[in-house]
Amino acid sequence: KTTNTFASVNDDEKPREECGVVGIYGDPEASRLCSLALHALQHRGQEGAGIVAVHDNLFHQVNGVGLVSDVFNEAKLSELPGSCAIGHVRYSTAGHSKLVNVQPFVAGYRFGSVAVAHNGNFVNYRSLRAKLEDNGSIFNTTSDTEVVLHLIATSKHRPFLLRVVDACENLKGAYSLVFLTEDKLVAVRDFGFRPLVMGRRKNGAVVFASETCALDLIDATYEREVNPGEVVVVDHTGIQSLCLVTHQEPKQCIFEHIYFALPNSVVFGRSVYESRRKFGEILATESPVECDVVIAVPDSGVVAALGYAAKAGVPFQQGLIRSHHVGRTFIEPSQKIRDFGVKLKLFPVRGVLEGKRVVVVDDSIVRGTTSSKIVRLIKEAGAKEVHMRIACPPIVASCYYGVDTPSKEELISNRMDVEEIRKFIGSDSLAFLPLDTLKSLLEDDAPNYCYACFSGKYPVQPENLNPTASMSLTGTMFQWQFETY
């Protein structure tokens, strides 16, 4: 077993995004464009990458462990002919990190073949898998995504789209899915937990991606989101929109705006950059402190720190420099090495920090151990005072919708109040963005977001969770609405 030690020593505090998906229909360079789009989504998963393309009704596949640049080169891309392709970058939330679990997955069934790439997590995966295995299904991976293929294969319907609908009726949790058949590209979204957008290139090629930054990189114009509860079908006849659930109430992951998405993306119809800037501004308004300089924990705290500094009228400076060159070093972890982790990733700028009252803006605190190391690092560089400002509310509950978070017991905000956390990390003051304030910033969109990690109230009931600690959504009957455009 190998472990990405250096990636974990700094980023172990952060919830890890689950995956990123791409789908392209109608471009002769589909696989190459797909690989470029996956580069733009690399932040959503670094454990593996894969692309499946279709040419003359034959599926061609290249999957590998590691970064997109590790998996794909010109020789590999030449093995992926065709004008239609789907791609995936993986961070495992259900299933182990090994090649067999790297998506997209491809399977044959009675009426053809299908490939799938999934961003999210099925909360009823275990019970679905057990039921399928009882009925004779044989699984090749430990990924929750494989159940979708089995559900499609065992559906009693013949048309592929009806098989997809049949499968979705059994799924609970978070899923943004792209499917590829011999002649169709299909995108499906659930309650809207995870983002999925649609764009178009100048030659008419249709593109789906987890974030708009992927569209930007391949010169595709953003058109709209795939709506919660929607299936979008692309084939030689054009584009059809199929509504699975009428008036589906979205439950969008707020952490996309706090941490996961790139700042240059538009997610859930909002600029991620503007969201983070406003989070920083409101922190400066609601939790001011006398200071000489504002710095960020790079990279995810930068935009919020800019907002804080602008509102407070205090200079923003780079007090911490992040190294991007040690994260792919694989060695067996040891505590001695872990103790050097933050120093390997973050280098303090003594000239910025020495003798100063420093505000440090970060996007979140999870376990608290990395925050304590950062505070110590800044004080060792000569800072007079260190004031931590966190651009999200305290995280008190785990996520079951495709984000890798620690258990509830490991979350420091579930065990300590703010003052206890301040003492634990060693800062001179500590303040979080209040949940009510966060909701007020979202205005009319506030009811459309999931705040389970801040409240413990789950919009879709996870398996093996105390029902009294969550809310359930009922009414999963699928209805059809057709719109052609």
From Swiss-Prot:
Residues 19-237 form the Glutamine amidotransferase type-2 domain. Keywords: 4Fe-4S, Chloroplast, Glutamine amidotransferase, Glycosyltransferase, Iron, Iron-sulfur, Magnesium, Metal-binding, Plastid, Purine biosynthesis, Transferase, Transit peptide. Residues 1-18 form a transit peptide. [4Fe-4S] cluster binds at residues 253, 399, 450, 453. Binds 1 Mg(2+) ion per subunit. The keyword Magnesium applies. The active site is at residue 19. Mg(2+) binds at residues 300, 362-363. NCBIfam families: purF. In the C-terminal section; belongs to the purine/pyrimidine phosphoribosyltransferase family. This is Amidophosphoribosyltransferase, chloroplastic. It comes from Vigna aconitifolia. The lineage of its organism: Eukaryota, Viridiplantae, Streptophyta, Embryophyta, Tracheophyta. The gene is PUR1.
